[in-house]
């Protein structure tokens, strides 16, 4: 179910830290004190820039060898995992209204069934996320 999207990211080492930007996603840039931090930050900012879009609306990734670089810039392909991003940044619980037969509701209540927990487990299983 989860798919990773790969984008070429331009890293530009500076006197202090590393500036990074994603040419395929307008306005998608950040920086870090180290290469590792910049890599972590760019994965987060890709998620922020794609927030609210469906995967089919994500920009097409350029080919890394077609990107023009200057000076000490270099390109790395960076993976964006929407499921991992959502688990980290969109874990807030939301209310859902559902309808079930009264007899089933009564039986579940009599057996101390936690509806929220049951629905979460059922959705995880139905979506094939139980192995992740």
Which residues does each PLM region occupy?
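Short aromatic-glycine-(Arg/Gly/Cys) micro-motifs in beta-strand/loop hairpins
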Residues: 10-23
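Short, charged, surface-exposed hinge/linker loops at domain edges
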Residues: 1-6, 44-111, 117-132
């Amino acid at each position: 179910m989860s798919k990773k999207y790969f984008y070429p990211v331009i890293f530009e080492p500076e006197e202090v830290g590393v500036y990074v930007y994603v040419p395929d996603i307008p306005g998608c840039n950040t920086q870090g004190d180290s290469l590792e931090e910049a890599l972590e930050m760019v994965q987060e900012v890709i998620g922020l820039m794609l927030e609210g879009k469906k995967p089919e609306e994500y920009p097409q990734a350029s080919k890394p060898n077609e990107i023009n670089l200057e000076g000490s810039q270099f390109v790395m392909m960076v993976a964006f995992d929407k499921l991992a991003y959502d688990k980290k940044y969109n874990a807030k619980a939301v209310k859902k209204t559902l309808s079930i037969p009264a007899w089933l509701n009564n039986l579940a209540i009599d057996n101390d069934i936690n509806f929220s927990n049951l629905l979460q487990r059922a959705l995880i299983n139905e979506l094939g996320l139980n192995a992740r």
